């Protein structure tokens, strides 16, 4: 099933503003300030971070359940870093941090499953061109 999102931008880059929607329930506003100056509103990198955290959590849960150790919960944060490279804004790193509640599993097995989820989740694969993608995984 295709996933859909849309955005509209009005005005010049530094003074304009935009709106976005993703599916039926996610929408917001964004601007130059929200993206580059910590101003109010959302930005594309936050949407990437949320998508990556969600996809990774689902992949980790599926992998653990497939190995016979279903999860009680997985909580994941993703931090997407945007820097200027060759004078162009570039996503230079993504840091995933996940904490799982998984009965009957040891830390090493959880970390191995998390690494497999990082490598295999569709969003990770779509973001394969990001120079640095790190993972910190632990059990609660």
Language-model-detected regions and their locations in the chain:
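Extended beta-strand/beta-hairpin segments
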Residues: 1-50, 54-140
């Amino acid at each position: 099933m295709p996933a859909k999102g849309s955005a509209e931008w009005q005005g010049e880059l530094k003074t304009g503003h935009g709106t976005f929607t993703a599916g039926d329930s996610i929408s917001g506003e964004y601007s130059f300030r929200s993206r580059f100056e910590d101003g109010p509103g959302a930005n594309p990198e936050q949407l990437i971070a949320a998508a990556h955290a969600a996809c990774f959590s689902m992949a980790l849960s599926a992998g653990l359940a497939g190995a016979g150790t279903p999860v009680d919960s997985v909580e994941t944060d993703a931090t997407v870093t945007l820097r200027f490279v060759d004078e162009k804004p570039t996503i230079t790193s993504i840091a995933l941090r996940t904490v799982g509640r998984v009965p009957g599993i040891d830390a090493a097995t959880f970390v191995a499953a998390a690494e497999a989820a990082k490598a295999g989740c569709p969003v990770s694969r779509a973001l394969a061109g990001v120079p640095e993608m790190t993972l910190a995984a632990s059990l609660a």
